[in-house]
Regions:
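Short, solvent-exposed secondary-structure capping/transition elements
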Residues: 114, 129-144
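Short, intrinsically disordered, charge-balanced linker/junction segments flanking boundaries
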Residues: 271-276
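Glycine-rich, often proline-containing surface loops adjacent to acidic residues and nearby aromatics
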Residues: 100-104, 126
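Short pre-active-site segment immediately N-terminal to the catalytic Zn-binding motif
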Residues: 104-120
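Metalloprotease/metallohydrolase-associated module, dominated by Zn2+-dependent proteases
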Residues: 3-99, 141-263, 267
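Structural motif marking the loop-to-transmembrane transition
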Residues: 1-8, 114, 118
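Active-site recognition of the HExxH zinc-binding catalytic motif
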Residues: 119-132
């Protein structure tokens, strides 16, 4: 890693040392890429992050942008310090912060959701990629993203998610489409697939993981709905029992009142046996 980093520095130094205009221009145009490579080479990649790279099918370039963002897995009690946005469904489980160009990932401990973290890591990697693109590059991608989004139809869950993002920040529509479509949508325009192939050796891996996660959420949602229905049924049963109890109590109270009134009336009971 250190040798590779020094090699990059040496290349830039040689270009400048020669005094050639092309050399200086190369360094200026590739300044961010040089920095990314140096940061990535010096980053001590945790085993978990290395696993995300493999599971999500990232390419060497995708892995570079992920590690250059120095991803950190953050425990739940600390996560809100870095990522504060809310979104429907799964909620926010990661973020790319432009203030320090870093990725923060929520530490998901539920084994049923072990496929989530690679998806979120890839999602945030694409945010890191997006913010490194020029306005011209972003504008060229926007119609492809809108085309892919339009083919999903108005009932697709992504419609609600994007609306929530836009309500929070209207400028977030295209960047979020870029990351979500890249990690969760299987069929995209050929030109867009070719673009994503820069960052994924096999994009179907991350889409498969996303599908698996949403199947888990669908199962959990069904279980919650079943539990809610059972509780509503129990509530109705309890309400029926309460009504029966109150009605029985009312009738009993009326009978007791009538008996007491009759008992206090001389001659109301002709014999002791009738009183008893």
């Amino acid at each position: 890693r250190l040798r590779a980093g020094l090699a990059l520095l040496a290349l830039g130094a040689l270009a400048l040392q020669g005094g050639a205009a092309w050399g200086a221009l190369w360094v200026v145009e590739n300044e961010r890429n040089i920095k990314d490579q140096l940061v990535a080479y010096q980053f001590d990649t945790p085993e978990s992050v290395a696993s995300y790279i493999e599971q999500a099918g990232l390419s060497e370039t995708g892995a570079l942008y992920l590690t250059a963002s120095q991803p950190r897995v953050v425990p739940s009690f600390e996560f809100g310090r870095y990522c504060a946005r809310n979104e429907p469904g799964i909620g926010v489980l990661g973020c790319y912060t432009t203030r320090d160009s870093r990725i923060y990932l929520y530490d998901v401990t539920d084994p049923r959701l072990d496929s989530m973290e690679p998806v979120v890591a890839a999602h945030e990697m694409l945010h890191a990629v997006w913010f490194r693109k020029t306005t011209t590059e972003q504008d060229a991608l926007a119609p492809l993203l809108e085309e892919a989004f339009a083919t999903l139809g108005s009932e697709h869950p992504l419609v609600e998610r994007i609306a929530t993002y836009e309500a929070d920040d209207p400028a977030s529509r295209i960047p979020e489409l870029y990351s979500i479509i890249g990690t969760e949508i299987r069929e995209v325009p050929n030109a867009l697939e070719a673009h994503y192939s820069q960052y994924f050796d096999d994009r179907s891996k991350v889409v498969d993981l996303a599908d698996r996660v949403y199947r888990v959420f669908d199962t959990l949602q069904a279980e919650l709905e079943q539990l809610s229905n059972e509780l509503n049924s129990r509530n109705a049963e309890i309400e029926g029992l309460r009504f029966t109890y109150e009605e029985t109590s009312r009738v009993l109270a009326a009978d007791i009142g009538a008996f007491n009134e009759k008992a206090n009336t001389p001659g109301a009971f002709p014999s002791k046996s009738q009183f008893e």
